[in-house]
């Protein structure tokens, strides 16, 4: 439902504070404060969490080199070293942990049914993919210039949300006249 997508979007807005608890990064006499790290992390909000960590790691390395600490210490600071340290500051390490946390925090823990360990039901694929795009990122199709979606009434709002993440191009959505994604809520062109 649209309400479910709205719940996911609200959760995604809170996610930076839930998933990342930065501490000071120390390398020799150099220190990047946790507060500064969080500001950099938030500055890259349009990127997935994993990419943000890498970008912040590069910022820390650049700051280290700029402050000329490298010359005094003599040891080079590698982006990979910083990224690994930042990764350890994540409170949830993968999309499945984030997906479980979403259901826990929204009070819908009983809605998440996992038939086997680390196995989701089909109904969970698109919501999981939607969150995965925020955590790990998804490969966007740059080759697709226009996406045509037929039988629109067979898709749920969360499926459309996930498709929008994967295909950031223009879309044409087709369906039979009088059929709706949610028959209990009519939308106009103004919506």
PLM feature spans:
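Conserved helicase NTPase catalytic core signature
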Residues: 2-146, 159-160
């Amino acid at each position: 439902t649209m309400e479910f997508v709205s719940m996911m979007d609200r959760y995604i807005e809170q996610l930076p504070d839930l998933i990342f608890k930065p501490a000071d990064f120390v390398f020799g006499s150099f220190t990047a404060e946790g507060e500064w790290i969080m500001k950099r992390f938030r500055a890259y909000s349009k990127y997935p969490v994993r990419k943000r960590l890498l970008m912040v790691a590069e910022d820390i390395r650049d700051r280290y080199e700029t402050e000329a600490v490298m010359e005094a210490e003599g040891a080079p600071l590698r982006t990979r070293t910083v990224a690994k340290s930042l990764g350890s500051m994540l409170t949830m390490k993968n999309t499945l942990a984030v997906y479980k946390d979403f259901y826990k925090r929204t009070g819908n823990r009983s809605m998440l049914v996992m038939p086997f360990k680390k196995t989701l039901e089909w109904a969970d694929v698109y919501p999981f993919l939607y969150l995965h795009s925020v955590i790990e990122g998804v490969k966007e199709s740059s080759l697709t210039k226009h996406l045509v979606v037929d039988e629109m009434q067979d898709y749920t709002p969360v499926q459309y949300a996930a498709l929008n993440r994967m295909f950031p191009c223009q879309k044409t959505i087709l369906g039979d006249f009088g059929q709706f994604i949610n028959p209990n809520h009519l939308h106009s062109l103004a919506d």
